[in-house]
Every structure is written in structure tokens, then in C-alpha cells.
Amino acid sequence: MKDSRTDEIAFEAARLMESNRAESIGEAIRAAASALGYHDVDLPGHGRVRKHVQGLAMQALGSEGYARSVSDVWRVAERIMTVLAEAVPDAEPLLVGRAAQGLIDGGVTLHVRVYTEASIGDVAQTLVDFGYEEPGFETAATRFGRLDRLRLADEGIEVLLTRCPPNVVGRSSVDLFSGKPVSTATLAELRRKLA
């Protein structure tokens, strides 16, 4: 039997995310359970919280406003992917994850892969040359080994760009960490969604 308190935690966590009072979904879940005094209850999954965040966003913005928000996020992705495709000779950018589906709830982070032989430093310099702020450099330990990443923001939207050497990471629709299927959108597909 499902415990309705689990859903109460999910809803409260969504409210915390929507009001920017939590840095991550995990933090929001823990804070919500604590605030409600539910210490012996199964915690909700991240997906359940995201559904509540999406519902709150649609309630606040209306369906047209939510659709505009999705388009705004896609435009940020399209701009950075266009810069990469046109300015880095062999680059093939790919939007991955929930944003590729148009799900922009819970403090969206755009996950962009760029398949290229160019160094992460060259990719970063290209972005700076095109007016982006200096990105932060990171490394991720994935199923394919250690991959270089850039973290930056555009119009208040966080972008996490992962450089994928084509000879190491095949172009695929799988999560780099879990190997599970993940939604993707090429630049051409993204442009069709925006048309």
C-alpha cells in the first residue's frame, strides 16, 4: 500500500525547488521530509518530485507560458550548439537529457555533448570568443573514462557541456554514467522544434 506521506514529501520538495530554496532535488527531498516531520517514511524518487515541479510551473505560467519557457531554454541550447557546429571544425553537438524532451522543471541544466577532436581549452576559447563568460572546467568519470566538461550559464540557464572524443565515445543515446537510454536532439532536430 502506498503511503500518501511520500507524495506529500514530493510536493513539498517541489515547492522548495520552485522557490529556489533548495540547491538540488535530493536536498529538497531531505528538507521536505524534515520539515514535515516524516522521518520513518519512504522518500520519493527524483522523477516524482520533477512531475510536481512541472505541475507547479504549468499552474503558475499556464500552458502557453510553460511552452514559452521551453522555447526559451531550447533557444539557449540552439545558440550554443550553433556556435560549436560552426566555429569548431569537426564538432557535432547533441542536446541530451530531459531538456531534449522539453522537460525543463526543477532548475534545468542543459546537458550538451560535443563530439570533437578539439581540446576542451579550444572549445572554451571558442565560446569566450563568441561572447560567453569564461566557463568553469570539470572532469567527469564516466563509463567511457574521464571526460572533460565545461560549466557555464546563458540567460540564467546552466549549461554543462561534455567533450566526447569521437574515437572514445560513440554517438549514442545512452547516459554516459549509467548506460541507460537518454533522450537526445541534434541541432537540426532542435531547430525543427523551434520552427
Describe the role of every protein-language-model region.
Residues 2-107, 116-195:
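Catalytic core of pol beta-like nucleotidyltransferases
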